[in-house]
């Protein structure tokens, strides 16, 4: 069975949500050491709270038909010490992104602050706050991360904001979109960036940009070294760097 789906979650799909439903799931905390999230099209919000007594996921499903709505799932299950949260269309469906047919689910997840999170998201905005550690693989959509222990992001497109990291903040790969990383207690790194501006501020450790295709790079107030490996185009500006500054020759 092949279903034709809208490529994104904006436009007609958002304004004309013909069929809607709520989804919910939860899991006990005892013995849990990690949460793994897989989300399809739609908004994804993950919030850590010191008051959380369970892991709770709630979703608002939206589709152009009842058949598609019935296939939009939100599953919370536990395997050993890991809780898995899966949101989106049933795996048995093949999807072609064309036309006006649409299906997506906006998901909010609440969990304790001491749990690390691994998340994979296909499209739509992502916001994460208050978790012990975050590893995020995102295809498209803006990303906002605040008040986390550490963060590692791989992103194809969309802007990235990271604000408030107690440890290290790393963007391993970013295809396009601006990146802003600020208030970091450890090191801050962008491994490879295709296009878009990059800004660092308030980093206690080292700042590293491995490879930058295009866009400006700005560093303000870094406690360690500032290093750029390769830079295709765009300006590089820095002030308040306590350590060594190493930039590519032009």
Name what the model sees in each region.
Residues 218-250:
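Hydrophilic extracytoplasmic domains
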């Amino acid at each position: 069975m092949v279903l034709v789906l809208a490529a994104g979650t904006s436009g007609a799909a958002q304004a004309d949500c013909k069929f809607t439903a709520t989804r919910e799931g939860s899991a006990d905390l005892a013995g849990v050491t990690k949460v793994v999230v897989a989300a399809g099209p739609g908004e994804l919000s993950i919030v850590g709270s010191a008051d959380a007594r369970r892991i709770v996921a709630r979703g608002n499903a939206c589709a152009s038909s009842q058949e598609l709505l019935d296939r939009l799932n939100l599953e919370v299950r536990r395997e050993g010490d890991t809780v898995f949260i899966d949101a989106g269309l049933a795996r048995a469906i093949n999807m072609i992104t064309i036309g006006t047919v649409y299906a997506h689910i906006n998901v909010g997840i609440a969990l304790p602050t001491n749990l690390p999170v691994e998340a994979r998201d296909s499209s739509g905005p992502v916001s994460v706050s208050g978790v012990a550690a975050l590893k995020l693989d995102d295809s498209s959509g803006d990303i906002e991360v605040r008040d986390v222990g550490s963060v590692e992001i791989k992103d194809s497109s969309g802007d990235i904001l990271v604000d408030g990291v107690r440890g290290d903040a790393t963007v391993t790969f970013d295809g396009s979109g601006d990146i802003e990383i600020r208030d970091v207690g450890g090191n801050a790194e962008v491994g490879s960036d295709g296009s878009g501006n990059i800004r660092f501020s308030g980093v206690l450790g080292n700042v590293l940009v491995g490879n930058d295709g295009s866009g400006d790079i700005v560093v303000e107030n870094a406690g360690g070294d500032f290093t750029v490996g390769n830079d295709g185009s765009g300006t590089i500006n820095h002030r308040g760097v306590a350590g060594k500054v190493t930039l590519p020759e032009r």
